[in-house]
């Protein structure tokens, strides 16, 4: 069983570790310069972004980083999903879908106009996941 919740300060080490895993997967491991202090300030002091985590057996197995955006065409705010990552051993169990449902509910509850993200064009597993859940390519 797993649960998704808003991240807290004590989650930062685990999230940073997962960010590094994602960066390695995307062949960008050398580009992660974020430290725990920078991350803490950005998330909890300046509130540039928000983080969600997924826990299973009291261990963080995935995370999502998002921030609020704005569409001039819609005249409404939205959510931009910066990162969505689930540890390899926990994939294909519905966790990614639950992260997106959590964010979609935030959009609905706050009358936001969209939930959007980008995916690398070579990331076939992620592209297949997004297609399976009915996401539209813009």
Which positions does each model-derived feature cover?
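A short beta-loop-alpha structural element at the N-terminal edge
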Residues: 3-15
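Conserved acetyl-CoA pyrophosphate-binding loop and the N-cap/start of the following alpha-helix
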Residues: 90, 94-102
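A short helix-loop-beta-strand connector motif used in the catalytic cores of GNAT acetyltransferases and
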Residues: 41-53
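Conserved GNAT acetyl-CoA-binding A-motif
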Residues: 108-118
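Conserved GNAT-fold acetyl-CoA-binding loop/helix
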Residues: 16-42
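Conserved active-site alpha-helix within GNAT-family acetyltransferase domains
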Residues: 97, 121-138
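Conserved acetyl-CoA binding element of GNAT-fold acetyltransferases
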Residues: 77-88
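Conserved beta-strand in the GNAT
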Residues: 53, 59-67
